[in-house]
Amino acid sequence: MKKQTAITNYHVAFAQSIGKQRDHNEDSIFINSGLTCDHTGGKPFGLFIVADGMGGYVAGEAASAAAVRAVSVSIFRSVLVPYIKDTIKESQISLHEAMEKSIKDAQSEVITSAPGGGTTIITALILNSQVTLAHIGDSRAYFIGHDGSIVYLTKDHS
C-alpha cells in the first residue's frame, strides 16, 4: 500500500476519458500543489488523488467523490496544515500512518455516503523531495523519466 521515492522536481498533468464502452465517468481527481517560502528557502508540497468509482453510475461517482474528499481532508489536517504552519518538522510526521489513516477514512466515508458503490484510489503526497504513495485497487502511479522511460510505482490489488 505504501512506497516512498525521492524526487527533485515534478510536472503534473491529468486527463479523463469515458472510453468506448461507457457513457459516463465515475472518476474523481484532486490536485493541490504549492510552495511555502521564507528566508530559509522554499518548501514544496503537493497532494494528488485519483479515485476510479465502480458500482454503477450514481454509486460509483458518489464513492469516488467521497473517497477523494475523505483522503484530502485527512491529509490536510494531519500533515499539510502543520507542515505549512511549520508547527511540526517533517521528521516528526509519520507519513505512512497518515496515509494509511486517510485510506481508512475514505473507506468509512464510502460505506456511509455511497451504499452499493466502491472505488479504487491512488494518492501521492509530496513534501520537499519525498513522495509517499498509498493505493487500493488498480489505480496506478507511474514515474516517467526525462528520457521517456516509464516505471510502475504501484502493483495492482485484485
Q: For each of these PLM feature ranges, what is it?
A:
Residues 1-158:
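PP2C/PPM-type serine/threonine phosphatase catalytic domain
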